[in-house]
């Protein structure tokens, strides 16, 4: 019997603009058992097709050689819930020249929160991933507080979070975030790839900046994360509500989409809640190529 679920997934062709002219783009890879995330510039090999065209990806100078490594290239836009879109391809990087790689899409995933809809799920759908979780009050080291990190956390609204699986497969996703007690909090599903990866390998890399298309400044943050079952503490929830829903400039957008709220609540209710708690260790300024 078919089961109806709410999905954010769309055809890659529906996000053609993210492929043809990405507002910001990033690359994630496992570089010798270390997760790496970099700002990149991306163009499509001619004839340009948003789905099948190889991506020509340029990375900043001074980074590890990515030739013949499996990579993830992600483009995203929109700090508001109903405008948050992402187009992700996975493939192998082939060297073309200095700091430039050709990536043929082996897998492509597109999602658009503004296009939530009900779809039928065929029988035999895989069981959701099961991950181990940390205790909500688990002790960790004191977080880092460099001035450039404080500025990035204050000025950014969507971070790129990169993680790696136990087998070394890189994964990257744009996420909302808030800070509390010197740590970075992000909500997600308990069955998400991010939760599974963090449980297997706590090291993460974050990329901030670039939400303004004209801004080439970025901040690369390295640290470690833990996955906690359930919603964040009330103080964190309040910060999320204020930062993304209740501020006047965002409350207006929310009210314009009030008819979609019920669908959004059903989408959230389909999976168990979890949140990621990130402790920063280093912060390095860089520029998009």
Give the positions of each predicted feature:
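Short alpha-helical
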Residues: 193
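Short coil-to-beta transition motif at edge beta-strands of beta-rich domains
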Residues: 21-23, 65-72, 155, 198-204
């Amino acid at each position: 019997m078919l089961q109806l679920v709410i999905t954010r997934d769309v055809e890659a062709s529906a996000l053609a603009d993210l492929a043809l002219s990405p507002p910001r783009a990033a690359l994630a890879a496992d570089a010798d058992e270390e997760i790496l995330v970099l700002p990149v510039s991306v163009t499509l090999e001619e004839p340009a097709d948003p789905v099948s065209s190889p991506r020509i990806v340029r990375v900043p100078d001074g980074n590890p050689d990515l030739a013949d490594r499996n990579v993830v290239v992600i483009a995203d836009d929109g700090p508001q819930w109903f405008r948050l879109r992402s187009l992700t391809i996975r493939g192998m990087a082939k060297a073309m020249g200095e700091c430039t790689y050709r990536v043929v899409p082996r897998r492509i995933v597109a999602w658009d929160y503004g296009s939530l809809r009900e779809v039928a799920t065929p029988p035999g759908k895989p069981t959701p991933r099961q991950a181990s979780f940390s205790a909500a009050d688990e002790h960790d080291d004191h977080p880092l507080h460099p001035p450039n990190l404080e500025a990035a956390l204050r000025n950014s609204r969507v971070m790129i979070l990169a993680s790696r699986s136990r087998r070394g497969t890189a994964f990257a996703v744009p996420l909302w975030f808030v800070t509390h007690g010197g740590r970075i909090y992000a909500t997600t599903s308990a069955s998400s790839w991010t939760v599974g990866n963090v449980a297997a390998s706590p090291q993460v890399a974050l990329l901030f900046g670039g939400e303004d298309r004209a801004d080439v400044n970025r901040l690369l943050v390295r640290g470690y994360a833990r996955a906690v079952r359930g919603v964040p503490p009330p103080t964190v929830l309040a910060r999320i509500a204020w930062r993304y829903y209740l501020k006047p400039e965002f409350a207006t957008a929310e009210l314009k989409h009030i008819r979609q709220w019920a669908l959004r609540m059903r989408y959230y209710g389909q999976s168990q809640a979890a949140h990621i708690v990130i402790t920063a260790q280093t912060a390095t300024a860089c520029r998009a190529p």
